[in-house]
């Protein structure tokens, strides 16, 4: 079994089953080439309740997905959900260098939005820019190239319980897999099925 460079792997550790899915990226989209499903009850309210059985469920699902796809799985995107997930809005404000908004100013504004009080038992999962304000002009989707001296980023920050995230990460790592990213399952679903207009 070889590792294909144009392959994405997702793992969903659910309340009733653990799923590993392998997709091959093609110009027209993603073709599902492998799936592994293991019945399990490893999560409760988004939190792992037994590390050892979670590891075994992931291992079995990954082995089945490898067998079906003919690919060796070394890393995966891991879905997370549960009642411990919270969201809050934030605002990041920065001065614009050179009076023209560039990609660096966007990134600095998004980073500035993370300077909020987050309890030590929580971890940021996603920082989702909603819109931008340039010198008081609101509702801007992409301010790159615009003239201005002040940039504000209106951002939605998604956090999760640090222990829940760490237990999922630990379980996947114990199977011998690297984690590409931990992704909020609802966000992944919206990316997969909604058009750009529907997301607005």
Q: Which residue ranges define each predicted feature?
A:
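Nucleotide/phosphate-binding catalytic cleft detector across ATP-hydrolyzing
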Residues: 1-15, 21-200
């Amino acid at each position: 079994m070889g590792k294909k460079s144009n392959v994405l792997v997702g793992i969903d550790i659910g309340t009733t089953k653990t799923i590993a899915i392998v997709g091959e990226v093609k110009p027209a989209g993603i073709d599902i080439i492998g799936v592994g499903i293991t019945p399990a009850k490893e999560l409760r309210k988004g939190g792992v309740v037994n590390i050892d059985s979670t590891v075994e469920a992931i291992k079995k699902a990954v082995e089945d997905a490898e067998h079906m796809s003919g690919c060796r799985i070394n890393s995966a995107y891991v879905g997370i959900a549960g009642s411990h997930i919270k969201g809050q809005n934030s605002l990041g404000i920065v001065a614009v260098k050179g009076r023209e908004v560039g990609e660096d100013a966007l990134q600095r504004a998004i980073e500035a939005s993370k300077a909020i009080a987050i309890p030590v038992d929580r971890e940021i999962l996603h920082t989702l820019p909603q819109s931008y304000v340039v010198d008081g002009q609101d509702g801007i989707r992409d301010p790159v190239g615009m003239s201005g001296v002040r940039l504000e980023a209106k951002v939605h920050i998604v956090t999760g319980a640090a222990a829940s995230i760490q237990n999922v990460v630990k379980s996947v790592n114990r199977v011998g897999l690297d984690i590409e990213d931990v992704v909020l399952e609802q966000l992944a679903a919206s990316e997969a099925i909604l058009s750009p207009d529907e997301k607005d």
